[in-house]
Every structure is written in structure tokens, then in C-alpha cells.
UniProtKB/Swiss-Prot annotation:
A Pfam family that the UniProt record links to this protein: PCNA_C
PROSITE patterns: PCNA_1 (PS01251), PCNA_2 (PS00293)
GO BP term, example: mismatch repair
DNA-binding region: 61-80
Listed PANTHER family: PROLIFERATING CELL NUCLEAR ANTIGEN
Disulfide bonds: none
UniProt keyword annotations, A-Z: DNA replication, DNA-binding, Nucleus
UniProt function note: This protein is an auxiliary protein of DNA polymerase delta and is involved in the control of eukaryotic DNA replication by increasing the polymerase's processibility during elongation of the leading strand.
Protein name: Proliferating cell nuclear antigen
Cellular localization per UniProt: Nucleus
GO molecular function: DNA binding; DNA polymerase processivity factor activity
Organism: Pisum sativum (Garden pea)
GO cellular component, one term: PCNA complex
Amino acid sequence: MLELRLVQGSLLKKVLESIKELVNDANFDCSSTGFSLQAMDSSHVALVALLLRSEGFEHYRCDRNLSMGMNLNNMAKMLKCAGNDDIITIKADDGSDTVTFMFESPTQDKISDFEMKLMDIDSEHLGIPEAEYHAIVRMPSAEFARICKDLSSIGDTVVIAVSKEGVKFSTKGDIGSANIVCRQNTTVDKPEEATVIEMNEPVALQFALRYMNSFTKATPLSSSVTISLSNELPVVVEYKIAEMGYVRFYLAPKIEEDEEETKPQA
């Protein structure tokens, strides 16, 4: 038996909005410690890892480890029916091929339940090794989203370069080029508006902007984003979910030679 009750139901809606563009079908894994998901995007370039810890739920019951295959677009459609202030409960019986979403208004004068068929999804769990990163940048998530959006009007790729001067985002395309530099600033009164850079050695890596723009769909989940870079590893773009866990996106850097074949189709 699985029963999870989340008072801040809008959180689940935001989580789904942040990942449904990248991943169509995925297994949600429930255990005694939390509700998680790990899935590759359809082109096997990006990986999404989600964790919602059990202690972040008002009520969390998971009698045994359970994997529930769901179509994320269908799940998002159901969650759209919940009001932003609604309490969301997710229920599934052992051996059942359906999951139930229950939405309660805060005054409890309206209760809706939606049942969705589960899917059989073959998915392999990729071991994500803990790594030491050459550079870690923490910055306001809205600023990162704006930079990715602005640069994608010029080019298809972004070079993220971290040095003593700060973090530089640059692109070039048919109409010209653009560089945006963010310097470390920790003196601001509001810590969530700070840009903090930890660097062991300089790093410069190139990534497809369409993926970065997709990752920024998670901006509503957190006021800051952490970008971890190392020359031989995928970048990690992490949005912490207050008191509960995180959404992490992993993306392999682009190598110059494969630039042509990975260009998005017009």
C-alpha cells in the first residue's frame, strides 16, 4: 500500500512542469525514504534525477518498494485539475495497475479523485557517481533562465566558462555573438540573489541551449540554481526543492565535431 499526502500540492505540479518536456514516460520509485525518479530524455543526451524525501510529506506510507510507470504528460494533465492550494494525496494498492490522485481544497469542501492507468516501463538505473567538480556556480535561478533565453535568440550552443573573473556564458550564430559575464557577489542582503563561485581550476564547456532552456522550466521550484562543471563530466544543473529534495539535470558537453548532427531540426 502506498499513500503520500502533500500539503503543498502546487509543488508537485511545478515538479511535473519542469520535467515533462524532457521525459515522456518514467518510473516513479517509492521507498521508505522517499519518492524518486531517474530517467533519460528520448534522445539519451540528458538525464533527470528527482528526489522528494519522505519527511517532506505530511503523511508518507510505503509498505514496500514500489515502481510506478507513468506517462508524465498524462500525469501533468491530472495535476492541472488540482488548485494551487489543494492538498494532493497519491494512493496505490499493492499489485494494482492504477494510481489515484486525490485533491482536497484547503477548506475541505471539495474533494476530487482521478485514477490513472500505470504503464510497464523498462528502465535501467544508471549509477551516478559522486564526483569532485572543478567549478561550482550558485546563482539566482531566474537570472540563469534569462541568460539561456537571451542567448538562444543568437545561437544554438552556449559555452560556460568559469575563471577567476567569474562565470561567462557565450554563444555565436549567424547574426553575431554574445557574451554575458556574472561576477561573484556575496555582499547582497538577500542570499538568494548572490552569485557564488567555487573554483579549483578553470573550466570551459559547450552545451546545447535547447536543453539548458528545458532545464530552466524548474526555475519556479527554487530561487537559486547550482551548476557543477568538470572538464570530463556532464554538467549538473540542480534546483533544490525546499526542505524536500531536488531536481537535477545532467547533460553531456558537446564536442566540436558532433556539432552538425546534434543541431535541432528546423
